């Protein structure tokens, strides 16, 4: 596409028409399966505690908030959707905006479209099957490859991520010319994520989608720990053509355990000099009330559309990315 004036959409109108058709196809996919579409707030008084996520925030100064009320733009609709699940919604999905105050570039935009869905009584493997069904319908791609996080590291880095100590991880990082970052990093999971991003991701999902599952228990986030191997969590990610497309969990239903994880996140934030974030106690209360056993997944729709259209960057499939917003 030739250079356009900044008032014009960065994406060709033809691409936006195809994008609209894909959005309609996604809705048909879930309608055919009896999954309810829901809408949840874009702003909340609480936010994520994950040390790797940076939310936008604003202040509400309307009636009843004379001193101002801090609100956070949602990085994902997960917390509100789980409250619906606890209230008895059954299977649900949402197509909506999420916001992350992070990078903007070829595969990132601070405002993006997220597809998130939850399936009561599904385990991680059954949900992976459904994700694959959706990808094949939208992308007309081959059947996926599936490998564990441990297998991925052993295959591409010749190191066991579940048993390697920090010295061994730094040694592996040195082989990737990452010593300038790894040598001063004390957090084991950050080292693992660095190795995964640089040493594993570029080699998986090149010709067909790749599901990587059983991430380390220390990276469980909102997922349950495997009952078969307590070293790993029931969590998966999906990669295709060098792009991370989705992140899914067999969801943690224990409110007390989830609260402990959030509190640990905030302690980690404090150690790193990051602001501590307000914990969503409405989510904790919903979990304690009773979240059904379920699995859920979040998928980046802009990236999905980019792959479906064979586009090179998100700005080819988004009308007005941040530079033109």
Curated annotation (Swiss-Prot):
Gene Ontology BP annotations: lysyl-tRNA aminoacylation
Zinc found in the keyword field: no
Keyword Aminoacyl-tRNA synthetase annotated: no
EC number: 6.3.2.-
Binding site for substrate: 76-78, 118, 251
Keyword tags: ATP-binding, Ligase, Nucleotide-binding
Any Pfam family matching the protein: tRNA-synt_2
Residues that, per the record, bind ATP: 100-102, 109, 244-245, 300
Enzyme class: ligase
InterPro entries: Aa-tRNA-synt_II, aa-tRNA-synth_II, aa-tRNA-synth_II/BPL/LPL, EpmA, Lys-tRNA-synth_II_C
This protein's GO CC annotations: cytosol
GO molecular function annotation: acid-ammonia (or amide) ligase activity; ATP binding; lysine-tRNA ligase activity; tRNA binding
Catalysis performed (reactions): D-beta-lysine + L-lysyl-[protein] + ATP = N(6)-((3R)-3,6-diaminohexanoyl)-L-lysyl-[protein] + AMP + diphosphate + H(+)
Record-stated family: Belongs to the class-II aminoacyl-tRNA synthetase family. EpmA subfamily.
Subunit structure: Homodimer.
Protein purpose: With EpmB is involved in the beta-lysylation step of the post-translational modification of translation elongation factor P (EF-P). Catalyzes the ATP-dependent activation of (R)-beta-lysine produced by EpmB, forming a lysyl-adenylate, from which the beta-lysyl moiety is then transferred to the epsilon-amino group of a conserved specific lysine residue in EF-P.
Name of the protein this chain belongs to: Elongation factor P--(R)-beta-lysine ligase
